[in-house]
Amino acid sequence: MAAPEPSRPGTIRVVIADAGPLIGLARIGCLDLLRALFGGVTITAVVAAEIGIDAEPDVCADRRPGASAIAKARAAGWLSIVESTAVPDVEPLNPGVDSGERTTISLALHWQAAGAQVLVIVDDRCGRAEARSRGLPIIGTAALLVVAKQQQLIPACAPLMAALREEGYYLSDGLVAAVLAEVDEA
């Protein structure tokens, strides 16, 4: 899929995700929160490869945890894949940025320059710092859960954060405490 161009500045909201948040949410059965919150999400082909899904709508390249649910989201049409070659590559300022984060940030910058309102879903510290340094708005998995609770899409954050941790998804004690305090679950 080629990168679409917005017709008027500020009229298109594009949500672009890195692999980590998608995998984490898929592994705890909450991937559909992204559809409920944003309607649709875009990933780059590099991120799709990291996850283990193919460009074909219902093909799961392997059996990595969460890959099947993410492939189903692609087949349902609310998760789209953009070829990484469809946008100019941006050299990261931070050497810790991986290829998925790099292409996610490149795509977000491309669409932002074309006038779209973008939001980047990323959890990795280096990826978040890189996106922030380039003026991109970001949100992480923990904040997504806060928004989902505020919009009454989930009854509580604590069990989902615990499930993420049980699946090996890193959430610092400080982050968990801050989120639970924010949603009155401390």
Predicted segments with their positions:
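Acidic, PIN/NYN-like endoribonuclease modules and their adjacent C-terminal/linker elements
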Residues: A2, Q117, R128-A186
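Active-site-proximal, substrate-binding regions of enzyme catalytic domains
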Residues: A2-L119, R125, R134-L136, G174, ...
